[in-house]
A protein has these predicted regions:
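Bacterial Sec-dependent N-terminal signal peptides
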Residues: 1-32
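Carbohydrate-active catalytic/glycan-binding domains of CAZyme proteins
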Residues: 31-412
Length: 412
């Protein structure tokens, strides 16, 4: 009698499971995950081998104790002139109440930054500061800088000192955002400049702004904010923030740009000039950083680095060799707000002398009142070289034919 050889029945779900498992195994063995690929391509590194691995610590400064009716904020970069540290900052007219743009007048403010002028302070050690007085005053009626000048930064070039700052012409330019009493901004909002042969002045303000908002359909069509400098290849890179792309109720300004850029509440662009006073030409690649609001830039090696307190890449450091194309190098930091770093060597051209990085600076804090804080960190070139050398030792070991790890190469 002939035996029946029955073929075992294979359920469809089991077959699908086997096929899925085989395909998954094949993919895992022949491909790399996105995270692992970024690591192997060198775009991310472990903390021990990342020259940007750091922490920011914050200390309250002496010399800026609480004064009723007085506010100071947005300090500039810090420079060293003859062994004395200098910084500049916004200081609104004392004892003026912030009442919002609908109620403000010549003695009350529309916003916290209204009725401001540029003041400065000096220090011998970076901890204890002494306010020296007003550096740049508001312009005469009818000028672009009549109502308020604020949020300064400093540049040293060609034997002169250049202060750049935001400027508002008139209270009539104050726009109410209606979200709350003091919401809104001056629209337009431009960048002005003053020049001096000494950090102590006297300062001569230029007759025209050095940068203005773009056309109505541009990403920076309303305001230009928070200027700061970097020098490369004989060119002056002026970074600036623009915002107010959110749909306001009512709209601060009309135009299609309110819709085109509604998902981009703030970003950073750059304008470049061969002369400190301009003319500045905005990069065709703008915006170059997606985020901003109290950002800080500094020269490092042959490029530039930046912190972003807000935006999709907030709490990070990003760097660009060309000053245009930034890539994140570390994330998850508590970065200074409105920070101005001490610029060792002041404003060197990084194509001539490598940027030395930063180790300290000054930022502002808003609570319990507007005041300055010192931040300390270690993003120095010296530390960066040391970390790179240590990483090179590991790479040499990985590529050597010897499996014995030389004790002399042990990292500290």
């Amino acid at each position: 009698m002939r035996k029946n050889h029955l073929t075992p029945k294979i359920s469809k779900p089991f077959l699908l499971f086997v096929l899925f498992s085989l395909s998954t195994f094949q993919y895992a063995s022949s491909q790399e995950s996105a995270s692992y690929k970024r690591f192997r391509e060198g775009n991310v590194q472990y903390e021990r081998y990342n020259e940007f691995n750091t922490e920011f610590t914050f200390t309250k400064l002496d010399g800026f104790e609480f004064e009723k009716g007085v506010e100071r904020y947005y300090p500039s970069s810090v420079i060293d002139v003859g062994g004395t540290y200098y910084m500049w900052y916004s200081k609104p007219q004392p004892n003026t109440e912030v009442v919002g743009p609908n109620s403000a007048n010549d003695s009350t403010r529309a916003f916290h930054w209204d009725l401001s002028e540029i003041w400065y302070a000096t220090s011998s050690d970076g901890f204890k500061w002494e306010e020296q007085g007003r550096a740049v005053k508001r312009g005469a009626a009818g000028r672009y800088d009549h109502r308020s000048i604020f949020n300064p930064d400093i540049l040293i070039a060609e034997g002169k000192y250049y202060l750049v700052y935001q400027a508002a012409a008139s209270l009539s330019d104050a726009r109410w955002g209606k979200a709350f009493k003091i919401a809104g901004d001056f629209v337009p909002n431009v960048l002005g400049m003053a020049v001096a042969e000494s950090p102590n002045g006297p300062w001569l303000a230029l007759d025209k702004p050095i940068l203005t908002p773009g056309p109505e359909d541009a990403w920076d069509g309303e305001v230009v904010h928070e200027p700061t400098f970097f020098v490369k290849g004989g060119q002056y890179f002026l970074y600036y923030k623009s915002d107010a792309r959110l749909p306001w109720k009512p709209n601060i300004s009309k135009g299609d740009f309110n819709k085109a850029h509604a998902d981009m509440p703030l970003a950073t662009g750059v304008a470049i000039a061969s002369n400190p006073e301009g003319p500045y030409v905005k990069s065709k690649y703008n915006p170059v950083l997606m985020g901003g609001h109290g950002s800080m830039v500094w020269p490092y090696r042959n490029g530039v680095c930046a912190t972003l307190p807000e935006g999709p890449e907030r709490n990070s450091i990003l760097c660009a060799k060309d000053g245009i194309n930034f890539y994140p190098v570390i994330q998850g930091l508590t970065v200074p707000k409105g920070g101005g770093a001490f610029r060792p060597g002041n404003f060197v051209d990084v194509d001539v002398t490598q940027g030395k990085g930063i180790t300290w600076g000054v930022g502002h804090a808003l609570s319990p009142y507007y005041h300055f804080v010192r931040f300390d960190t270690d993003l120095s070139l010296e530390k960066g070289d040391r970390v790179r050398n240590e990483y090179e030792l590991i790479q040499n070991y990985m590529n050597s034919g010897d499996y014995e790890y030389d004790a002399s190469l042990q990292l500290k």
